[in-house]
């Protein structure tokens, strides 16, 4: 463990009062301890750790949100991941399945599989994110066409934000990848970025100075949804449960915008017990689906089971897929806005 990491452990250990509030929403703590105070004390005394420990954390930030004294295990475990990368000289243990992330990221920044900013006739671009592009290219195209109507001249940038690399602890490689984005933003004179992904919203917002980063949901809420979709959900005779993605748990404008969109659609929906700033991860956070698949699978099942309605509606592609793996019928809000999935749902419920 690096000296810096040890100092972080000491800070968190001193702050922790052992109330276990964080354990209500964290599966990895249940695997490694009965009380986070004990775990932090052990790390402090040993000055070392099992490399799987930090890669079992979903890095969702729930702990810091609910902790009465401000303990932030996400920041600590991300730093410990960086220690593992440094100590292994970038060659992470095979059990972490990091090669899958490396391949994904190399393709996501390859000129063969991605493009530079296209169709830019203003200072605004749409940054849909790699998950949405890979899973729903039709929806990305339709969403972009909508944006071109309400914000003429909007360009589009088909790249990844690099967060998978950052969350694996490879900060140097992340800076290299993110530098590609910054160079393109600078050369094309981009000033405003509309993101379709919660991870992209946070990553670009936290790492780009002087750029305005806006969520697609805020744009949709203020500009209005496509006219032909207004009130269309009123014809459905079943309900939805809304799942808030964890990356933007602290961004209230996104929470409000999404709920405004659902109301414009005319959808009947309910809230999960853990919602908004206290939402739970879907199980895909922190690349744990690769590094500790059992923890991810168990937590996904738990989160999906917390929805009482026929369908789960969310606004993150990874969350959508996770809820389906958890055994629920799940839709991305863009499925309803820019693809005719209302008809599919009606057929399913006949």
Give the positions of each predicted feature.
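Conserved beta-strand elements of the Class I
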Residues: 125-126, 241, 313
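Hydrophobic scaffolds flanking metal-cofactor catalytic centers in soluble metalloenzymes
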Residues: 15-21, 27-41, 52-55, 248-260, ...
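C-terminal amphipathic alpha-helical segment
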Residues: 223-264
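Cysteine-cluster motifs in flexible loop/terminal segments that predominantly coordinate metals
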Residues: 16-22, 60-63, 283-288
């Amino acid at each position: 463990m690096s000296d810096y990491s040890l100092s972080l452990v000491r800070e968190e250990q001193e702050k922790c009062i052992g109330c276990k509030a964080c354990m209500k929403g964290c599966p990895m703590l249940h695997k490694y301890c009965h009380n986070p105070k004990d775990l932090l004390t052990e790390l402090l005394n040993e000055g070392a750790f099992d490399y799987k420990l930090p890669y079992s954390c979903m890095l969702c930030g729930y702990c810091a949100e609910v902790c009465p004294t401000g303990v932030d295990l996400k920041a600590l475990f991300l730093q410990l991941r960086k220690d593992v990368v440094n100590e292994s000289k970038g060659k992470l243990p095979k059990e972490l399945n990091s090669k899958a992330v490396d391949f994904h990221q190399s393709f996501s920044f390859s000129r063969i599989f991605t493009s530079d900013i296209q169709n830019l006739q203003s200072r605004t671009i749409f940054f849909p994110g790699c998950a949405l592009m890979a899973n729903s290219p039709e929806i990305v195209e339709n969403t972009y066409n909508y944006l071109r109507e309400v914000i003429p001249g909007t360009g589009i940038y088909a790249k990844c934000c690099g967060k998978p690399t950052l969350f694996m602890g490879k900060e140097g490689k992340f800076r290299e990848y993110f530098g590609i984005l910054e160079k393109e933003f600078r050369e094309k004179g981009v000033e405003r970025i509309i993101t379709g992904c919660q991870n992209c919203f946070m990553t670009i917002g936290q790492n780009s100075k002087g750029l305005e980063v806006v969520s697609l949901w805020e744009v949709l809420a203020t500009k209005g949804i496509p006219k032909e979709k207004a009130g269309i959900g009123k014809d459905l005779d079943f309900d939805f449960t809304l799942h808030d993605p964890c990356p933007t748990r602290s961004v209230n404008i996104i929470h409000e915008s999404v709920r405004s969109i659902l109301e414009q659609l005319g959808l009947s929906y309910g809230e999960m017990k853990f919602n908004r700033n206290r939402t739970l991860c879907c199980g895909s956070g922190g690349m744990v689906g690769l590094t500790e698949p059992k923890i991810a699978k168990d937590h996904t099942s738990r989160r999906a089971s917390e929805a009482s309605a026929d369908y789960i509606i969310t606004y993150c592609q990874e969350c959508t897929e996770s809820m389906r793996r958890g055994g629920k019928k799940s839709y991305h809000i863009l499925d309803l806005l820019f693809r005719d999935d209302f008809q599919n749902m009606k057929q399913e419920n006949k």
